Amino acid sequence: MRKQTKLVAVLSAAALLAMGASMTSFAAGWEKDDSGIWHYYDSDDEMVTGEWKKDGGKWFYLDDDGEMLTDSWVDDEYYVGEDGAMLINTWKKTLADEDMDDPEDDGEAWYYFGSKGKKTQDDDKKIGGKTYYFDENGKMRDGWYEDENGNVYYLGGEDEGWRASGWLWLEAPEEDDVPALGHDNDDDNDVCDEEGWYWFASDGKMYKKADKKKINGKYYFFNEHGQMLYEWINGQRVSGTPSNAIADGNAATPGSSQAENMLYANVVEEGWRADGWYEIDGAEDTDASDDTDWYYFKDGKAKKAKFASDDKVGFSAKDKYRAKIKVSGKWFCFNEIGQMQTGLQYIPQSNGFYYFDENGYMKTGKVANVEEDNDSFTYYFDTKNGKLGKGVTGEKSGYLYWNGKRLEADDDYRIYKLPKGDKEADGYDYYLVNSKGKLQKSDSKEYDVENGNGYTKVKFDFVGKSYKLDETKLSAEMKADASTAKIELYDGDAEYTDFFK
């Protein structure tokens, strides 16, 4: 804002100045001396001193020497302009009265003189539709300001001064300026950026609670210093205190255990609470800042597997968690920190294997070229509700599957065994497959069995017209040599062979 310092025209004295009168005398009135200084004489022809005189609707001041003051303070409360008239309803940028005689002082400040000419001081005042604050000496306040009740305002630059509202990008305040915020720029452990976004309500009060706030229909997160938080945020609640949301990267013990505390807001230019899909770097506090992955957020919280035993992949040498979660009618897989997973995944809650394509969508039916242990296999996933997407176990369209994986011989034929029930005591069914996984059931054909122990060109008996080998006709040696299936995950970090889970 550029304040306009209005110089009023003096109807009597100023008119004489304009006409260049050399010396004008009145029975009672104004008189200009040879030095060009105006004086006022009363009806007794006495020079008036130390008084205000009104002329043409304006007030003028005669000092102790009877000289009309110009561009000067009067009693540290009033100010007369260059024409000598008292300033009324007017801004003036000048030195304080006590500093006027110090030519080296450059500490000018703005003052406002009201309808009676007195400076406004130790108060707030609405001027031209905007609210300003003045200190006990009448100086207009600017920048960060904290009132006696601990409310924090921002009053613009030194030539602005009006109380701000809405969003402002500002340098973080010094602790001395705003003690209520407790922010210390010199403290390396301070959680604020040097600059950031701050929110000021319509009454100018800054929001300074470590919590979320709805602004113009969107939620934003703030720390206890009032600075808006953005991107990853650790919203851990400290015992006995309100929410103490802090920026990511300040957790004492980073790792997956922090996932439940993490929130996400948009980048600093936006900042509102995230909803929907985001492809972003992970949080420092979950040790994932070097990884870029897809996350799905609802109210700022990532959809994720629970950091608990129910979602833990128990057969993995490393702690891994997986959950199958529906998003907008489609199924996706997420780990314990919310990273979307692709490829073959074991879902503990369903006790089964599922496949998620490169875009994260769960697949059903036949899926070829599933990577596993430096090889690729064909899988089949259920298409029926109730088991939708789960890897099929047993016979399917003339092929043999286990947890979705098609069981095949390496070159010739191989005997596989699958459990009959949920307990090992229930026994096994035995099957014969070729290198394409096709089930065999010819009792007249001789088969080269690659997993046999010294026997080839074997004929088998089958149970009726089924694909099951007649186990009563199988030798103990053949049963012992029958292959059991396995599935490898996580680049060989985990191997699944558990029939009875």
Q: Across the structure, where does each feature detected by a protein language model lie?
A:
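Extracellular adhesion/carbohydrate-binding repeat motifs centered on closely spaced tryptophans
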Residues: 2-501
